[in-house]
């Protein structure tokens, strides 16, 4: 989100549950590379059915020890070259999706401006962004932004411009 230049590199890390079209659109808005936060064991539609008490996310919600989701990788190519990082995630029970926590714990955000944003049809950003900042304990974390399901590309582009 935003423009890349020789003195500043921007990137976006995010856990997403949508398809490639949305990913290409996000890359266009960012103007920089994307890094997908991918659980080692992908979440299926059934896993994400929060109204089913036997679903994976419901069990993880009820038992915090299950929330330590292993990721395929936490190594972002050229991580040290980034000065601004956007972290996007869906909201689960008022918090960032569990895989995002694992990514944040595994990386050093020293010297980086971190701009969190979330997507949710109904839940607010809440304390999800400040909780991620506490997990990271490094970096200059900015106030987060929630985008609802009706947000369009122009809304996201306008927000990114405000961050620059």
Stretch-by-stretch model annotation:
Residues 1-82, 94, 157-164:
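N-terminal beta1-alpha1-beta2 submodule of the flavodoxin-like/Rossmannoid cofactor-binding fold
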Residues 16, 20, 24, 97, ...:
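Short, surface-exposed alpha-helical segments at coil->helix boundaries
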Residues 35, 112, 141-142:
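Secondary-structure boundary/capping residues
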Residues 40-42, 122, 149:
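Surface-exposed, flexible loop/turn segments at secondary-structure boundaries
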Residues 44-137:
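Helix-loop-strand module that forms the ligand-binding subsite of alpha/beta enzymes
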């Amino acid at each position: 989100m935003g423009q890349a230049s020789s003195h500043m590199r921007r990137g976006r890390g995010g856990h997403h549950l949508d398809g490639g079209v949305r990913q290409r659109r996000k890359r266009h808005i960012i103007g920089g590379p994307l890094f997908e936060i991918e659980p080692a064991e992908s979440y299926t539609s059934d896993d994400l059915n929060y109204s089913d008490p036997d679903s994976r996310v419901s069990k993880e919600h009820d038992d915090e020890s299950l929330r330590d989701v292993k990721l395929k990788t936490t190594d972002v190519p050229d991580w040290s070259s980034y000065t601004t990082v956007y972290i996007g995630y869906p909201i689960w029970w008022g918090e960032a999706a569990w895989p995002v926590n694992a990514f944040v714990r595994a990386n050093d955000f020293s010297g980086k401006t971190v701009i969190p944003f979330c997507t949710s049809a109904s839940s607010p950003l809440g304390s999800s962004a400040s909780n991620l900042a506490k997990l990271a304990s490094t970096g200059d974390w900015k106030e987060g932004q929630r985008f609802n399901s009706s947000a369009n590309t122009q809304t996201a582009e306008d927000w990114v411009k405000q961050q620059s």
